[in-house]
Curated annotation (Swiss-Prot):
Organism: Brucella abortus (strain 2308)
Domain of life: Bacteria
GO biological process, one term: amino acid transport
Protein name in UniProt: Leu/Ile/Val-binding protein homolog 4
Cited Pfam families: Peripla_BP_6 (PF13458)
Alphabetical keyword list: Amino-acid transport, Signal, Transport
SUPFAM superfamilies on file: Periplasmic binding protein-like I
Signal peptide range in chain numbering: 1-26
Task of the protein: Component of an amino-acid transport system.
Family: Belongs to the leucine-binding protein family.
Family matches, as PANTHER family: LEUCINE-SPECIFIC-BINDING PROTEIN, PERIPLASMIC BINDING PROTEIN OF ABC TRANSPORTER FOR NATURAL AMINO ACIDS
């Protein structure tokens, strides 16, 4: 089944669910996907959509919640905070008790604040926000609150594991450079890279923050990196800022390895080709990392959606697996949805995903799960973007090994 057909089927199922629940006595659980579904960043939003429909479809196949199919509502946030704010209001007006989103930390910052403020004004009618992929540290730091849960890594998790994995393999070296986009995510990455240097055993000899998606020629930046004589380049760059940086590095003959967070974004390997070989990424999934379990998931996901899970999809699926497990422990409350009970159940839930043990830390609502450090290689079983290259895993960290400490800035007020 193609992704297009699958998505159309998912929308149809959601519509049927809406119709079927109309006469039911129990209040249906409505989940609103508030995601970037149009515009230049829609490719990532559509991946989240595929993951949400895949896993919520699994939950509905198993009986849904409280004897009813979960209703899936969709709203296009158009890639920005203003659009997201409007769509969250619309979703709540339409009866959604849970908001899901992932493809932008700026959008996530808007949504989490909107949800927090709404909940303060509407005691007993609180809305949950399930963050599938926005990774800014502040979301589980200064902006943490009881009704927000993050199911993805953050900068601290990604760059601790990628550095330690490279160190353990003997490919990190001693001298490192940090180059990142100049906004919250890039600053988080730079701070993490610097903070980890002494413990893991490398020196950050220089660092750069640059404009986001405005630079066409990274040659001057690469010249600066080359002059620093480094072994590893840490970068949280994504999209063209990653591709153009790596192409400029290859053109200049830079020998340093790139330690990245988003090298697995669809299209990156297709565009970079041989330039990407040997470079490193740390993510929550690799189909070869956990034997039959991880490969079986990859094949099932492809069967349903038309493509192998990659980039943001696995983390979203695994997070919703935990959510589904939590729902099993929520008792019906006189036919009404109680999101506080659901939130408490998520805090206490654990699940065995295709990558291993997955749980939620109650202190700040940061999920805990394995991370896989992997390199671009021709030896990978599943190839990326129709090329001869894929991602070959060489180090897996458990959730306990991967997760970062609770940030001091998180002061979560609990209900009651």
């Amino acid at each position: 089944m193609s992704l297009k057909v699958f998505l159309q089927a998912g929308v149809a199922c959601a519509a049927l669910s809406l119709a079927g629940a109309a006469g039911a006595s129990a209040e249906p659980l409505k989940i609103a996907l508030v995601e970037t579904l149009s515009g230049p960043q829609a490719s990532t939003g559509l991946l989240y959509r595929a993951a949400v429909l895949y896993q919520l479809g699994k939950i509905n196949e198993a009986g849904g919640f409280n004897g009813e199919k979960i209703q899936i509502l969709e709203y296009d946030n158009q890639g920005g905070p203003v659009g997201a704010a409007d769509r969250v209001k619309a979703a709540i007006a339409d009866g959604a008790q849970i908001i899901v989103q992932g493809s932008s930390s700026a959008v996530a910052g808007q949504i989490t604040e909107d949800v927090r403020k709404y909940n303060l004004r509407n005691k007993g009618k609180e809305v949950l926000y399930l963050n599938l992929g926005a990774e800014a540290l502040e979301l589980t730091g200064s902006k943490c609150h009881f009704y927000h849960f993050r199911f993805s890594p953050n900068a601290a998790i990604r760059f601790k594991t990628v550095a330690q994995g490279m160190k353990d393999k003997g490919i990190l070296g001693e001298r490192a450079y940090s180059i990142n986009q100049n906004y919250s995510w890039g600053v988080d990455v730079e701070n993490t890279v610097v903070a980890n240097a002494k413990e893991i055993g490398y020196e950050v000899v220089d660092k750069t923050l640059h404009e986001v998606n405005k630079i066409q020629d990274f040659s001057p930046y690469v010249a600066k990196i080359q002059a620093a004589n480094v072994d590893t380049v840490f970068t949280g760059n994504w999209s063209n800022d990653l591709l153009l940086l790596m192409k400029a590095a290859s053109g200049a003959g830079l020998k340093a390895k790139f330690a990245t967070s988003f090298l697995d974004q669809p299209g990156n390997i297709g565009n970079a080709g041989a330039i990407a070989e040997g470079h490193i990424v740390s993510t929550p999934f690799n189909p070869e990392a956990n034997g039959e379990a991880s490969m079986a998931f990859a094949e099932d996901y492809k069967k349903v959606t038309g493509h192998y899970p990659s980039y943001v999809e696995p983390a979203a699926v695994f997070g919703l697996q935990l959510f589904g497990e939590a729902l099993k422990n929520v008792k019906p409350g006189e036919g009404k949805i109680n999101t506080t009970d659901i939130a408490l159940a998520i805090e206490n839930a654990s699940v065995k995903t295709p990558m291993g043990d997955y749980s939620m830390r109650s202190d700040d609502h940061q999920a805990k799960f394995p991370m896989v450090v992997q390199e671009v290689s021709k030896k990978a079983r599943i190839k990326a973007d129709g090329t001869e290259y894929g991602f070959l895993p060489f180090k897996t960290f458990t959730g306990d090994e991967s997760i970062d400490p609770v940030q001091e800035s998180c002061s979560m007020k609990r209900p009651g």
